[in-house]
Structure formats: C-alpha cells, structure tokens
C-alpha cells in the first residue's frame, strides 16, 4: 500500500492593488488580525496596509515588533502577547527573519498566518519551515511547520522602498535553489512526483534571472515597477518556495547553503554579509565541484554584472 503524500502549494497575489485581496483571503478566518512586523518594514508599508485592512473591515488587535533576530525566544514572546492571542489570524510584515519568526509563532498557536514581504530576498513568505538563529546571530535550527502561510501579498511599491542590496542578495539566493536541487538529484534515483515537480520548477529560479535580473535591478534603483521587476520578485519569493514545499528534504539544499551555515559561524561574515551574498559564493563552488564550467562562467559573469 502506498504512503499518502500531501503538497501544499503557496498562494500569492502580486501588484499595486494586491492588498485589495485582504477581505476575500483573510475574511474567511474571522475579522481580528494581529500585525507582527519589522521596524523598518512597518515604516515602509503601514501607509498601504492599514487603509487596506480598514477597507476589508478587519479589526487590528495590535501591532507588535517581532524583535531583531529570528530566535525561538522572540517566537515565544509573540505567542504570549495578548493582542496575538486575541486575534483570529496573524499578519507578518517584514523580511525573511521576521516572517520566519511569526510563522513559527503561528504554528505554536495553531493560528493561520498571512505574509507581506517588504524586501525580495528569499522564499520565507511562502515556505513551511522557519530558519532560526541564536541571539548572537549564529544559526540555530530549522523547525518544520504544519502548514505553509495561507496567502502571500506582494505590493511592488513596498519592495521599491527596500535597500537594493537585499534584492541583489535575493537573486543570488534564488539561483542557488536551482543549482542545489539539480545537484542533489544527480544520483539518478527515480524521483517522487513532488521532487520532480519542485526540481523542474527550479529552473524558474535560474534562467529568467540571467535574462531579467540586471534590468530588474536597475529598475529597482530607479524605483520603477516594470514587468521584469515583478518577474524577478516572483522568481526570488515564489519559485524557490515552490521548490522548497514540493521536493523531498534530501533535495532541498546543498553545498551553497551548507557553506552559508558554516561560514556564518564566523561573526565577521554573519555581521557583514547578507544571506544571498554568501549563498551566491556557494553556488560558484557547487558549479566548480560539478565541473559545469559553462554554467559557472555564465553565473560568474552575471554576478559581476549585478555586483554580487
């Protein structure tokens, strides 16, 4: 008898009217929402989010600063907050560390969580894992969660307010997802459906970046919402997330991220380099070890062009 397998694919909305979907998506779970956010993230996005919540007739039980690091203690503190306990659902607003912290808190509480990424730098807005750190910023562990976030809302105007360095690093992180999953599946064993789906989808993290990445970066610098910019945002946030939630854990990682976890145990690297910057170096190492010199050359030239 076969073993049951489930895949929960992410749902998302992107566009300057993305928050108009609050009522349809969040209203299914009640009308009380606690907003947990990063400090800079809230300053950049609250002008769009609060009116949209009011328009959707959703009552905000409170706004809570998540902390400054994705730690288990911060997740516990969120679960203990009265406005969070009172809420029907949680809305996480911020970067990857904020979203992972809120996702873990929601998992502990058994409450639905919605996400609004304010930077395009990783797939945390839609995955069912949380990458957690110690108070000093060193890597701790990766708890697996019961569910993916219910819905991810992406307003590109919010992404435009973030420093360009996060977007650049996000491109590097996404491209690693394709290289790592391809490498991990090289043993030749028959893939289960989910793994084949995820690894095939992983090409969206790579080839469109080579095509659109440089222009999208320039568009971001000029604060212009373009088709290329939105495509790259989706291929940073959504495409690698589809890989993550679909593939068997054996294929969800590789040399690039292993190097990241090792290198960031060095304080000067953890403090001075973004996740995607370190991972992009690991991508080059992975391609070198794989002797895929054509991809190595293409990726190296692309990294040089965008400043990775």
Regions found by a protein language model. Give the residues of each.
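ATP/NTP phosphate-donor binding region
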Residues: 1-88
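C-terminal charged capping/lid subdomain of soluble metabolic enzymes
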Residues: 3-7, 18, 292-308
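Solvent-exposed alpha-helices and their adjacent loops that cap or buttress functional pockets
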Residues: 4-6, 28, 82-85, 106, ...
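A glycine/threonine-rich phosphate-anchoring loop and its flanking beta-alpha core
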Residues: 10, 108-201
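Short glycine/serine/threonine-rich phosphate/pyrophosphate-binding segments
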Residues: 42-46, 97-103, 123-126, 252
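A short, small-residue-rich loop immediately preceding and capping a beta-strand
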Residues: 82-105, 109-118
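Active-site segments that bind and position negatively charged phosphate/pyrophosphate groups
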Residues: 192-300, 304
């Amino acid at each position: 008898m076969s073993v049951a397998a489930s895949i929960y694919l992410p749902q998302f909305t992107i566009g300057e009217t993305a928050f108009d979907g609050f009522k349809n998506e969040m209203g299914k779970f009640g009308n009380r929402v606690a907003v947990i956010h990063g400090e800079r993230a809230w300053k950049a996005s609250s002008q769009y989010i609060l009116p949209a919540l009011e328009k959707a007739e959703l009552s905000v039980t409170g706004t809570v600063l998540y902390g400054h690091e994705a730690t288990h203690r911060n997740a516990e503190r969120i679960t203990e907050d009265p406005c969070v306990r009172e809420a029907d659902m949680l809305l996480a607003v911020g970067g990857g560390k904020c979203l992972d912290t809120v996702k873990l808190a929601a998992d502990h509480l058994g409450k639905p969580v919605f996400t609004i990424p304010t930077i395009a730098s990783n797939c945390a807005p839609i995955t069912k894992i949380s990458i957690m750190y110690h108070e000093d910023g060193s890597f701790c562990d990766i708890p697996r969660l019961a569910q993916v976030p219910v819905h991810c809302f992406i307003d590109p105007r919010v992404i435009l307010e973030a420093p360009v360095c996060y977007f650049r690093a996000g491109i590097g992180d996404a491209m690693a997802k394709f290289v790592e999953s391809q490498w991990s599946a090289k043993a030749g064993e028959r893939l289960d459906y989910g793994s084949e789906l995820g690894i095939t989808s992983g090409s969206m993290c790579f080839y469109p970046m080579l095509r659109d990445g440089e222009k999208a970066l320039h568009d971001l610098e000029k604060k212009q919402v373009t088709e290329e910019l939105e495509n790259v945002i989706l291929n940073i946030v959504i495409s690698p997330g589809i890989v993550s939630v679909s593939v068997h854990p054996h294929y969800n990682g590789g040399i690039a991220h292993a190097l990241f976890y090792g290198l960031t145990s060095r304080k000067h690297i953890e403090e001075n380099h973004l996740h995607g910057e370190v991972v992009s170096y690991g991508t080059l190492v992975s391609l070198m070890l794989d002797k895929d010199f054509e991809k190595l050359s293409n990726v190296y030239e692309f990294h040089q062009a965008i400043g990775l």
